[in-house]
Swiss-Prot record:
InterPro entries per UniProt: AA-permease/SLC12A_dom, APC_superfamily
Residues exposed to the Cytoplasmic side: 1-16, 70-95, 145-158, 221-237, 305-339, 382-394, 439-452
One matching Pfam family: AA_permease
Subcellular location(s) of the protein: Cell inner membrane
Source organism phylogeny: Bacteria, Pseudomonadati, Pseudomonadota, Gammaproteobacteria, Enterobacterales
Record protein name field: Low-affinity putrescine importer PlaP
Topology in membrane: Multi-pass membrane protein
Main location: membrane
Cited function: Putrescine importer. Required for induction of type 1 pili-driven surface motility.
GO CC field: plasma membrane
BP-aspect Gene Ontology terms: amino acid transport; cell motility; putrescine transport
Catalyses which reaction(s): putrescine(in) + H(+)(in) = putrescine(out) + H(+)(out)
Amino acid sequence: MSHNVTPNTSRVELRKTLTLVPVVMMGLAYMQPMTLFDTFGIVSGLTDGHVPTAYAFALIAILFTALSYGKLVRRYPSAGSAYTYAQKSISPTVGFMVGWSSLLDYLFAPMINILLAKIYFEALVPSIPSWMFVVALVAFMTAFNLRSLKSVANFNTVIVVLQVVLIAVILGMVVYGVFEGEGAGTLASTRPFWSGDAHVIPMITGATILCFSFTGFDGISNLSEETKDAERVIPRAIFLTALIGGMIFIFATYFLQLYFPDISRFKDPDASQPEIMLYVAGKAFQVGALIFSTITVLASGMAAHAGVARLMYVMGRDGVFPKSFFGYVHPKWRTPAMNIILVGAIALLAINFDLVMATALINFGALVAFTFVNLSVISQFWIREKRNKTLKDHFQYLFLPMCGALTVGALWVNLEESSMVLGLIWAAIGLIYLACVTKSFRNPVPQYEDVA
């Protein structure tokens, strides 16, 4: 019995419709630039008012991993992302476990975004049952993803542009306030980056929290099979998404830090967005921004929905998941329809699910993917392809991915205990499932050979 799934020339495949700009917009929508207002209070408290520097540290750390993604996308332009890279570069067993763990990140991300939207709606319209909002939003998200990835990309492009415009408007009000004497009282200051009471360790601690603001930049690697010239476009898109997102975070928090030099004005620093809107722009603007925040989390949910459906499609095509369901592509829409519907059904759990638990699941999956993408570069290029002869080889295929792995290691150290426990339980379930698929590992792990 063969356990390698060979390509079928008559099978329905995903349609290539995306170019660089839509892919970057998908990544930025996933990241949600507006999240900078949510995390500002807690990180400002941790760093004694040096949030921009913490973001700079986080950006540098993330860019190492972004470079690793770029190298592997050129080698394996498949929709499977970290799953495919670990499968081909290290081993099919490791690849499955990475893919299984990554499902925690991707599978629950749409639900978390719907859950956040539900929370916003409950604050705006408490008289309407929240389950109605959840069902309506999930139906909208699923319908868009079913029809085409291009429509999702177009929707997300509009939302990202509007987010940037809204951030610019808020920053305009912040600048005006500082100019009129609020906060630091000056627009030119090095204090948001460094001051006499600055300490590196708290900034690194803040950076570990802010790194999770970048979660999602990697998800666009799942769009490789629907992107024209993916070997060139996807690596650039991944790097640009992380870089542009990071620059927005640093630029915006510089001015916010001038307006709020410390956290003394915040009643609840852990949920600073509503208070920032209230202090800077007033009650009416706060309500409007809350409504728009609902739309931004929906856009992020749509991007996550698209990504996980394609990861499940690749795992189904490989045969590690039932192929007839997970490997199905709709003949007209050319989308993984069954997976999209399944993810939509899981997102309905937002009707009654704990946000803290869902977030814990996501963090574990993201760190597994980041770690093994960096290790896959070393395994594939430095070890397997023996690109270890020159100083340039050592720098590109050993030093840079090692830096990426070490920076991710700092995130592992700061991972919540609940994330680790839930993640390990999920990994154990995956290992048991894999043992069943391979008949106690006597048979090889199924894999699709078209990408090698």
